[in-house]
Amino acid sequence: MFNPTHALLIIQRRGSYLQPVLTEYLTRVVCEQQTGCQTCPSCLEILHGTYNNFYSFDQANPFKREHALHLSEVLNRQSESNQKQLYLIKNLETLTATAMNSLLRLIEEHPVNTYGVFTTKNENMILPTILSRVQKVVLKKATQLPFQVDSKDQAILKSFFSVDEQLQALDNGSFTRLKTIITTLTNKKNTASTVHEAWVLFKQLNQTETAQVLNFMVDYTKDLTKKDRLLNMVQNLVFNPPKAALFANLINW
């Protein structure tokens, strides 16, 4: 495991498993034994999600310029204490330019006893000035999975970027929705009711989930002409094409 640093960027590759690495690193930072023992009070607070000086941002709670200003004030005020201060920003590549520039200043002027942890799935979308000021670690594809599924389900789960997302999909039901849609799209003998059920689910998908379905179909089809059409559909998702048109193209192969 890498040594604690004031700014760590964890670069995720497809099939990587972030959570155990993140937990091990955070406990090592705060550990009263300086080993990441996972038994001392500070380690246990990290494991139970009750560590007091820990600030977390993700897509549900995106990091913005005002957060950087507030964090800077809070972290500087609390830096006189001996307790380690942590802030985590997931999916750094999704931040606005304004937020990234504000974060850059926070990294450059980091208070003592403060540790920033960032994750990304595409480091090429991060400001070079940030990349030059952080320690980088690359997470490769996980060799072991924390769950067991059959081979057909495994193929669908691979459409999710990381093991963490696969676990979340199994837990929140999004995997079941994708499985129903994909099963219908890959079955040539559907009934009207199964097509209707798939359509109802498909039109509820967000852009990321829609891309997952399309990318699965790209891998699934052996027809090069169809592959090209699917890849064009993936690239055109940024223009928010009508869901009905996408579904019609997929169901009428």
From Swiss-Prot:
Gene3D superfamilies: P-loop containing nucleotide triphosphate hydrolases (3.40.50.300). Pfam families: DNA_pol3_delta2. SUPFAM superfamilies: P-loop containing nucleoside triphosphate hydrolases (SSF52540). This is Uncharacterized protein MG007 homolog.
